[in-house]
UniProtKB/Swiss-Prot annotation:
The keyword Hydrolase does not apply. Residues 169-309 form the cDENN domain. GO terms for cellular component: late endosome. Transmembrane segments: none annotated. It is found in: Late endosome. Its main location: other. Disruption phenotype: No visible phenotype. This is DENN domain-containing protein 10. One of its GO terms (biological process) is protein transport. Residues 1-147 form the uDENN domain. Residues 311-366 form the dDENN domain. It comes from Dictyostelium discoideum. One of its GO terms (molecular function) is guanyl-nucleotide exchange factor activity. Guanine nucleotide exchange factor (GEF) which may be involved in the regulation of homeostasis of late endocytic pathway, including endosomal positioning, maturation and secretion.
Amino acid sequence: MATSISLEDSITIFEKDQNSDVLMSWCFPTITEDLKSVILNRTSLLQEKISLQFSFSKFKNSWIYIYTTSVETQQINKEDGSITQINVPDSLKRVVAFSLVLVRNQFNPEKYGSLAQIMSSVYKQTGDCSKLLECQLRVFNRGQFDVGSMGKFVDSSFDVRRSYLQTSIKDIIQLFGEEIILIWSAMAMKKRIVVYSEKLSSLLKVIRALPLFVFHRQNWNILRPFVTISDLELKDLVSTGVYCAGFTDSSIKSREDLYDILVDLSSKEVSVSSQSKDQFILGSFHKDVLRFLLDSLDDEEITDQNVIKGLNLKMKELLTKLESLKETNEETGKSSITLESLETRKLPNGMSTFLFNIANAEGLNG
């Protein structure tokens, strides 16, 4: 049975002890020191309370899936206040919480969230890391494993296309109203997008939907769903060039050097950075796209798939027009679209820049 699980995929355990010290207790096969540092920054073990049990993020070319579990040694009866001791493996008796981290090369939060959850249950019950390797080997060899009451994992039941559509594109349109056109424009032109939210759960739900606005590219690798403001992470972010990056640190709002548009989930506002305003002059095409997006909210029969197909069609029409605007260089014999050639056509204000950006984003200039 074919599986996307590889024996090179790492499984790592980070544990928080009774003294609030957080350490990497086990890893197979290995991770770099940089990746270890990034995971520590992103796990909620460093916080007093577990803010979100499951999160997904990206560093360099690796997707990071973190599932965090509390280890209770006793349970309080709500009715009479009596305390019942919980049987905990010896290896976990000084552990108050642990994060099981899967590092993979593909985006599929539902798949790896399920796998991490089941593995976490196995580790919490046994405290035995070798049992995690058994799970990994069974998926690699058979495409599935069953650990009874702790869960069953079947690799083939997780279609990545379902992960793409997990958040409704209509919900995102509803959230931002008319300002959604700025998000569409930024995605279409491959501009740098920063999304801010106080809550990581809200951040992850929204940011994963942004590639839906340019679904024809099917590129979820542009996402950096959760980034901290550490120098290491920001350096990696900048090196990618184009990204949709999520932050929960409000100081990111003042870092205009890192974004072309800022999507603030807390205020439900979208703002353009001062150095990028000339890239976001809206014309008749933008108004047409915006009308289509807003009209979809008024018709319950229009599905998310209908919206995505409609956007794909509008982009196809735009690209057909761009192909007709190509000019051939007499020296090289190559056809391309230049900003200069567009400006000679005396298009409406801002349209030349927009079309040139689209041409580059879609690879029309080679």
